[in-house]
Amino acid sequence: MANIAKQLTDLIGNTPVVELGKFSALKGLKKPLLAKVEYFNPGGSVKDRIALAMIEDAEQRGVLAPGATIIEPTSGNTGVGLALVSAVKGYKLILTMPDTMSIERRNLVKAYGAEVRLTPGKDGMKGAIAEAEKLKAEIPGSVILQQFENKANPARHYATTGPELWKQLDGKVDVFVAGVGTGGTVSGVGKYLKEQNPDVRIVAVEPLSSPVLNGGQSGPHKIQGIGAGFVPQTYNAEVIDEVVDVANDDAILAGREVGRQEGLLVGISAGAALHAAVEVAKRPENADKNIVVLLPDTGERYLSTVLYAFDDYPL
């Protein structure tokens, strides 16, 4: 029987898990860390999952008509995922983002057919959100999917990412580590894993200089993709056992090291999750545990950032 996907969105999910033997040895760990590699999604990141989920949810609720306009304030991977899914499904997509975002980011979503509206960089994401709301008021039948509030976000991780992981490891998951942007991944996967085994420990990761999940003040940081500066509605603290705060340089170093050791080119938030996973794995009680870390995206989106500025930012 032919094994042919009907459309690209059918290839979202079912990402592989790989053992990080050399990286773990470099860090002096007794047992190798395991990584779920989300850049195997067609759009190159974990956000393909929620882009498809939020659009399908809007369709099922009847708020998104065929050919309608989707608007979303996003400067990152969610925009890429939405652009890919919108292209497949025939929706118009307008993404609002600060004008400080890289040319690569803008051109990447344009390549999928999305329209980009830039807002003043000094206004940050709040400016992009305000522009999205303005556009929604002007365009009949348009919708804003609101990834930081949309229940379809953690629900998709509960329905897919969590079960995939459980099956891939034959239920032998002791600790799960993931960064928190919207919190959808760690909350959805965490809920599923704890339903299978309440003893599984769920570790959330945020920037040290913006430790809001640990009750601290928001602040600037270099770890793109996590640390929104507020606690999202899509983050479920009830399934989280611990929040690890990671410094910028530790995230950058781990991201670089896993590329050199394992051939895994990842983004800076993956570096943060890796560093946190190493810290957890070094504890004596975790020496023989299966620790899984989720790597959200590819490093190709960060080649012009501090992550790969080897000459200007040596570590």
Outline where the language-model segments fall.
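PLP-dependent amino-acid enzyme catalytic core
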Residues: 1-315
